[in-house]
């Protein structure tokens, strides 16, 4: 059970973090900024910032997954505990990712990268801010 939770959290980290980087245009600039902030916070292990850049539903889903790991401290506590299982190699991959495409439609955006191997990251505008949304 713990192994499956570890795999889930590693998969979430890869799916959420690797696909994020650059775009162009007004909403696209905002998506880019949110994406870059998310990646920087993840690399710095600034879990409070990482969680602030996630939708409320995404945080709730992460917290439910974290219950399997007995992670305390809400979203931040789950990321802190999960980071111990992610490993340095996965974290170093964040240094070498590149955006392939960005598509903004209303309050949702899709960001894809080569590193994500066909698994795009979704962002959603929530309270006027672009946030990572893995509930979509």
Language-model features, listed with the residues they occupy:
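Short helix-adjacent coil turns
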Residues: 38, 42-50
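Short beta-strand edge/turn micro-motifs at domain boundaries
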Residues: 110-113, 118-136
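Ser/Thr- and Asn-enriched, surface-exposed coil loops between beta-strands
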Residues: 103-107
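Bacterial signal peptide processing site
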Residues: 24-27
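Bacterial N-terminal signal peptides that target proteins for export
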Residues: 1-12
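C-terminal motif of bacterial Sec signal peptides marking the signal peptidase cleavage site
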Residues: 19-22
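Short solvent-exposed beta->alpha transition segments
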Residues: 32, 47-102
């Amino acid at each position: 059970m713990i192994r499956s939770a570890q795999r889930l959290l590693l998969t979430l980290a890869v799916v959420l973090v690797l696909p994020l980087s650059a775009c162009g245009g007004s909403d696209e600039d905002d998506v880019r900024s949110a994406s870059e902030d998310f990646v920087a916070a993840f690399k710095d292990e600034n879990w409070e910032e990482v969680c602030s850049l996630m939708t409320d539903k995404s945080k709730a889903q992460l917290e439910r997954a974290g219950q399997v790991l007995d992670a305390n401290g809400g979203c931040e506590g789950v990321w802190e505990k999960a980071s111990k299982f992610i490993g340095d190699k996965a974290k170093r991959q964040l240094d070498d990712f590149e955006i392939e495409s960005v598509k903004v439609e209303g309050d949702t955006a899709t960001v894809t990268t080569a590193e994500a191997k066909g698994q795009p990251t979704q962002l959603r505008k929530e309270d006027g801010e672009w946030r990572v949304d893995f509930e979509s």
